[in-house]
């Protein structure tokens, strides 16, 4: 029971006050609710949209010369960007994708297989060969698309659902054709609903050997993957044992297929022969250092089986290792080094093949985190150059350009940055210039508060993703694109094909 | 409206208690798991898997802290505009500001772990403020609720 006492004053004044008492709370509520509702509404995505319509164009300081629209007149479709259509394939690979229960380390985990296993078959080819992959999706309900991570394939073959193709539904087929133009360690994985599909094991190893082969006697591809919390190498929980005679030299091709960086170290000194499929120039022996392998990245480690009958351990994190040596030879787990190998100064300088100083485009890729709405959901979201998805930049280049990108992580978490279709060379980190071997990457570990200056040559036309390979972050909108002037894509995100590249 | 205001303020306080509980639950689970030989690193953290059940504590903490508590604090603030009680808006605003600060300090802890200590301290401030915000409201119904049992207890059988 509330008793209102009659306050002194005229009736008009009281009515005015009463009006204010009613109106002010309503106005205050409107002032809070309306902007939030507007932001929510603005963040919702249409039923189908093109990446060409997303965000804003960033010409990298180059004069804007193709009009205001992302879609230029008489643009070529990315579907034309294929590999030597008249040339017969040198290698044919048939891949069938299925959705099924995996048996990992005694546990049953819902996942995906390629040709009945996860990881799928290792594809091993020689440099220069034209590979033809016939993909058939047997039972992956959300559809699939295969991305050739680290190989700079023609754009139509890049396997990004909604950008370079439609997701392949159950019962349908897609043929990928590309030339393995560089030797090195790569991998393939789904780029349709990539976060759950990669986590569920829709992936495999792809090794390109140089025409003359390699010098090491033991050559092992080791895919590190975590299935439902179980750490594996090549799909098996625990350590991977590789039999080898004492004294044998080995190349362990390590791929980190998870969402976070992984440390790699060995029980004896090693050399880091290659990073992301590119050979390091004159790599030196390393001891008491760990190699940081970011999500999606590869490292080729060279070491030797000891002569004393013991084995050598290559640790893929604390949890798993590749153990190489005579049968049942033992080797204790080496302690995790406190320092990491700094690739900024590892190896010896060599010519890059282009001049970064003559770059015609300069882009910023500034990573932050702020509250807001993405796809209609409230939260703390990753921002690119201050914008939330889909207001992300579309970096525009022209074929032949040299582009510089300043990547700066202003957030408090690490981001493995992956540019499709190109290799970037690191020029500097936190403003300190690189002094070692040319450090070419396709997946770059950008730790919190770190900045990198990288350069790439625009030599592979099309429309390419430039995203965080922590695929959860990508699914949350940490995705920008790189487009070449004069190209357009007929594919749409969402839409009838339900393309969801992240 | 007073009832709604009071209940919302108490829910914020209860949520802070839940946040503290689930976090310590998760850490206890982690310690036990590591003790049994488990390795917890970025790959496991980002795999979306639940290597030990108590991981749900972290997930609940994140969802609560990012969405649920701010949403309740915002509704409390809006409710306060219509609650004709002196100081209601001020206290709802204090709760709201502490909630926003709590989130920001929490995220800051990813970079500067010491901010995590402040996150814990601010949680106590938020709990106290939310509890007081609810307690200081005398709803129309509350005197009746408080008085009735006393009357009954005093009545000889």
Question: What do these predicted ranges mean?
Answer:
Chain B
Residues 1-157:
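Polytopic transmembrane helical bundles with strong interfacial aromatic enrichment
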């Amino acid at each position: 029971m509330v008793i209102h006492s009659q306050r002194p004053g005229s009736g008009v004044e009281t009515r005015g006050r009463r009006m204010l008492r009613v109106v002010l709370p309503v106005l205050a509520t409107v002032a809070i609710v309306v902007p939030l509702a507007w932001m929510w509404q603005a963040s919702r995505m249409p039923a189908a949209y093109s990446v060409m319509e997303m965000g804003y164009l960033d010409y990298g300081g180059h004069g804007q010369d193709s009009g205001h629209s992302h879609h230029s007149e008489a643009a070529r479709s990315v579907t034309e960007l294929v590999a030597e259509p008249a040339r017969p394939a040198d290698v044919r690979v048939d891949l069938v994708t299925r959705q099924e229960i995996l048996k990992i380390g005694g546990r049953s985990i819902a996942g995906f297989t390629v040709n009945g296993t996860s990881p799928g078959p290792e594809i091993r080819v020689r440099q220069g060969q034209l590979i033809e992959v016939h993909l058939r999706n047997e039972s992956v309900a959300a559809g699939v698309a295969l991305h050739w991570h680290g190989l700079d394939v023609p754009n139509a073959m890049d396997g990004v659902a909604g950008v370079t193709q439609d997701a392949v539904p159950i019962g349908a087929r897609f043929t990928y054709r590309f030339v393995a133009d560089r030797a090195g360690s790569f991998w393939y994985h789904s780029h349709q609903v990539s976060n759950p599909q990669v986590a569920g094991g829709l992936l495999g190893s792809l090794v390109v050997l140089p025409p003359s082969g390699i010098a090491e006697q033991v050559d092992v591809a080791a895919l590190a993957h975590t299935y439902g919390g179980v750490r594996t190498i090549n799909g098996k929980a625990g350590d991977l044992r590789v039999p080898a005679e004492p004294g044998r030299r080995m190349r362990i091709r390590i791929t980190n297929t998870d969402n976070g960086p992984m440390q790699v170290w060995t029980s004896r000194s090693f050399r880091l022969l290659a990073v992301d499929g590119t050979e390091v120039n004159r790599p030196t022996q390393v001891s008491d250092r760990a190699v940081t392998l970011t999500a999606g990245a590869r490292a080729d480690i060279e070491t030797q089986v000891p002569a004393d009958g013991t084995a050598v351990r290559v640790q893929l994190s604390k949890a798993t290792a590749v153990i190489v040596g005579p049968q049942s030879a033992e080797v204790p787990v080496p302690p995790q080094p406190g320092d990491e190998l700094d690739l900024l100064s590892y190896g010896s300088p060599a010519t890059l093949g282009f001049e970064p100083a003559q770059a015609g485009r300069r882009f910023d890729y500034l990573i932050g985190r702020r509250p807001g709405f993405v796809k209609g959901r409230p939260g703390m979201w990753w921002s690119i150059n201050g914008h939330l998805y889909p207001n992300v930049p579309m970096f525009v280049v022209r074929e032949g350009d040299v582009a510089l990108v300043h990547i700066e992580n202003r957030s408090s978490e690490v981001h493995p940055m992956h540019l499709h279709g190109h290799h970037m060379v690191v020029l500097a980190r936190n403003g300190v210039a690189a002094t070692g071997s040319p450090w070419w990457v396709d997946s770059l570990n950008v730790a919190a508060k770190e900045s990198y200056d990288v350069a790439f040559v625009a030599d592979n036309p099309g429309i390419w993703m430039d995203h965080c390979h922590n695929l959860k972050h990508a699914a949350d909108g940490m995705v920008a694109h790189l487009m070449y002037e004069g190209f357009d894509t007929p594919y749409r995100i969402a839409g009838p094909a339900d393309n969801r590249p992240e | 409206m007073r009832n709604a205001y009071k209940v919302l303020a108490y829910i914020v306080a209860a949520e802070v208690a839940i946040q503290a509980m689930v976090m310590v639950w998760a850490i206890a689970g982690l310690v036990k798991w590591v003790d049994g030989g488990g390795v917890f690193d970025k790959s496991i953290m980002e795999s979306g898997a639940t290597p030990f059940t108590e991981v749900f504590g972290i997930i609940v903490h994140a969802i609560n802290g990012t969405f649920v508590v701010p949403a309740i604090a915002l509704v409390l603030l809006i409710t306060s505009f219509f609650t004709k009680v002196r100081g209601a808006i001020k206290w709802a605003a204090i709760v709201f500001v502490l909630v926003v600060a709590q989130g920001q300090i929490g995220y800051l802890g990813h970079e500067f772990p010491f901010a995590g200590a402040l996150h814990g301290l601010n949680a106590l401030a938020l709990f106290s403020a939310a509890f007081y915000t609810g307690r200081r409201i005398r709803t129309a119904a509350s005197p009746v609720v408080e008085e009735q049992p006393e009357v009954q207890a005093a009545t000889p059988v």
